[in-house]
Amino acid sequence: MQVDELLKPFPIKEFHPFPRALLGPGAHEMIGPEALKLGFKKTLVMTSGLRGSDIVHKITESMKYHGLEVVLYDKVESNPKDYNVMDAVKLYQENKCDSFVSIGGGSSHDACKGARISVAHDGRNVNDFEGFNKSENPRNPPHIAVSTTAGTGSETSWAYVITDTTTDPDNPHKYVAFDDASVATLAIDDPVLYYSCPIDYTAQCGFDVLAHASEPYVSRLNFEPSLGNALRAIKLTAENLRQATWNPSELSGREGMMYAQYIAAQAFNSGGLGIIHSISHAVSAFYDTHHGLNNAIALPRVWAFNMPVAYKRFADMAEAMGVDTHGMTDVQAADALAAAIRLLRDVGIPEKFTDVTQDSYSKNRLGQGPTKFYEQASVIKGDDEDVDRITNHVLGDACTPGNAKECTFETVRPVVDHCMNGDLDDLLS
């Protein structure tokens, strides 16, 4: 669907594919045999490097044990940049690779998806493919996506997100490319790989899951096949995120979040997203903050904004989050907002963007080191100019047309301003 089509009613719904997947403890050990089945011979492995863990080393050594040649690109940054993608494409072409493996969270997977699309088009700039199904060659190199976080679900979706730093260097633009040709060939979700994920990152990724689940549940697309997965993912997140954050070495919480992220991604894959993601994209474009952190801060404000047009859906979400709604009207039962705020506070996430500093998220996941962009990250200002430019970015985001409530500059600007400067308790009064 094109963005202009999304602005109209949705008479025709579209179901988008997701890949074959291996899920569960130990699944990552299957990468060698699975790669051989898919015809891999010389593989470009794309990752952030996952500093502080030996995951990449173990997986690449396993691949070599099975006779595969490995070329490593480990400079993917958080909010992957167009130059990350194009540097990887150059490395792929120079080494005559025939396949891709991405190891990490959404940044590694998204950069890899963009690289695959570029390679299939003889190395064209990845920014040429912003939009909906802009690729012209449906055949691209095979790709195994190995997740080390429970967050984006990028390993199973048809979307990838890239930051365009070249079109207007003074105003970087983070965009979503939706492309059926970008879907991974095989997804591997193994909760054992999550053990090395820092606690703060675990919490923030969990709110990415909650955003992925809640937005399609109230989306204007109202896509019936997504609703069951969305509600189940909300329930799993409410039941498991505290455990995964407070007891990170305990398997049950990690495994619960693995399933939550996987089915939440299947929900939004066809059910759409909204301005939680639009706000997140805008803030990370200008400040390079972590996507999950941005979603966590935006989520309560956007829920409050959307609730008046979807009380019944929010009542369902409240029940899924453990609120006793027996005997209440839908308006009374729509207490999911309070449940979300309690969860955010329980797992220790900053409550507004002006509380965020460079110490608010794990730097070992931010591509520190040889980077062209990280130096631009700074403390968020949150002044009128900041709110205006972020609001304008939100209105141009591909996720905005699916939002439950219609969005204009006048209606969205107060939401953005509250994300920047507001007190969460104001939403409960």
Swiss-Prot record:
Q: How is its activity regulated?
A: Inhibited by azide and hydrazine.
User: By its UniProt entry, which InterPro entries does this protein fall under?
Assistant: ADH_Fe/GldA (IPR001670), ADH_Fe_C (IPR056798), Alcohol_dehydrogenase_Fe (IPR039697), NDMA_methanol_DH (IPR026338)
Q: What Gene3D superfamilies does UniProt report for this protein, alphabetically?
A: 3.40.50.1970, Dehydroquinate synthase-like - alpha domain
Pfam hit, one: Fe-ADH
Q: What happens when the gene is disrupted?
A: Cells lacking this gene are unable to grow methanol, ethanol, propan-1-ol and butan-1-ol, but are still able to grow on formaldehyde.
The answer to whether the entry has keyword Magnesium is yes
- Decide whether keyword Repressor is in the record: no
Task: Outline the inducing conditions.
Answer: By methanol and ethanol.
Cofactor(s) listed in the protein's UniProt record: Mg(2+); Zn(2+); NADPH
The UniProt GO MF terms for this protein read: alcohol dehydrogenase (NAD+) activity; magnesium ion binding; NADPH binding; oxidoreductase activity; zinc ion binding
Q: Which reaction does it catalyse?
A: methanol + A = formaldehyde + AH2
Its EC number(s):
1.1.99.37
pH note: Optimum pH is between 4.5 and 5.
Q: Name one GO biological process term.
A: methanol oxidation
The annotated thermal profile of this protein reads: The MNO activity increases with temperature up to 55 degrees Celsius.
- UniProt entry keywords in alphabetical sequence: Magnesium, Methanol utilization, NADP, Oxidoreductase, Zinc
Q: Which family does it belong to?
A: Belongs to the iron-containing alcohol dehydrogenase family.
Q: How does it assemble?
A: Homodecamer.
What this chain does, per the record? Catalyzes the oxidation of methanol to yield formaldehyde. While the in vivo electron acceptor is not known, N,N-dimethyl-4-nitrosoaniline (NDMA) can serve this function in vitro and is reduced to 4-(hydroxylamino)-N,N-dimethylaniline. It can also use various other primary alcohols, polyols and formaldehyde. In addition, MNO is able to produce methylformate from methanol plus formaldehyde, and possesses a formaldehyde dismutase and a NADH-dependent formaldehyde reductase activity.
Protein name per its UniProtKB record: Methanol:N,N-dimethyl-4-nitrosoaniline oxidoreductase
Which organism is the protein's source?
Answer: Amycolatopsis methanolica
